[in-house]
């Protein structure tokens, strides 16, 4: 049992949690321990670590910055280390207090996505001298052992991935498919750039097409 189970292990506790984090009444919530949510999660449901709410500013429906970041990298919330939720929350606060419009692209420009076995994906500053967020904890031990499973209206129509994925994974389309696409256009469009296209086809042997991480 994780350290956060006591917050939601009773009906009264769950109601307080729902009220504190402003989770809509039409959203279903139930607790799942580490290693249990894989079998407990049903189609259309999402699993989120409790630490994401306590320290990561997670909201239901999910905030635009967090949702777009997860969609961009094809990650589910269960794959993210607490460090990632802290960074995204801090950037959200910067947007609100300083009237900024930082997006997941800005996050990706400053931070690199790394994976640590047993910990999940986390964010590391590309350059130590350039950091949006300071004083992040160096240890996440014991913080990702409690999860909540959300059902029904947990998203606004554009959900984040609910199944664990892998950044950069996907199906491949070889150069033959690329040639077929190019030949579907009038030849006159390419005559003046023939050598460029020929070089382009030779250099690109395959194109990565992202899988559909939103199917359950």
What residue ranges belong to the model's regions?
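Residue-register detector that marks a fixed positional context within folded domains
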Residues: 1-216
């Amino acid at each position: 049992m994780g350290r956060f189970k006591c917050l939601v292990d009773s009906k009264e506790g769950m109601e307080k949690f729902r009220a504190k984090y402003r989770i809509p009444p039409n959203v279903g919530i139930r607790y799942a321990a580490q290693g249990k949510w894989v079998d407990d999660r049903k189609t259309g449901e999402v699993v989120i670590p409790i630490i994401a709410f306590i320290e990561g500013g997670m909201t239901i429906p999910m905030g635009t910055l967090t949702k777009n970041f997860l969609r961009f990298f094809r990650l589910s919330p269960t794959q993210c280390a607490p460090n990632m939720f802290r960074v995204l929350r801090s950037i959200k606060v910067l947007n609100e207090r300083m009237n900024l419009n930082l997006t997941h692209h800005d996050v990706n420009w400053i931070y690199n996505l790394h994976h640590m076995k047993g910990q999940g994906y986390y964010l590391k500053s590309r350059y130590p001298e350039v950091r949006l967020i300071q004083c992040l904890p160096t240890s996440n031990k014991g913080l990702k052992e409690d999860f909540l499973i959300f059902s029904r209206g947990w998203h606004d129509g554009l959900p984040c991935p609910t199944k664990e994925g892998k950044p950069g994974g996907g199906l491949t389309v070889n150069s033959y498919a690329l040639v077929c696409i190019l030949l579907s256009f009038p030849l006159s469009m390419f005559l003046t750039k023939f050598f460029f296209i020929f070089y382009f086809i030779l250099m690109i042997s395959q194109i990565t097409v992202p899988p559909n991480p939103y199917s359950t």
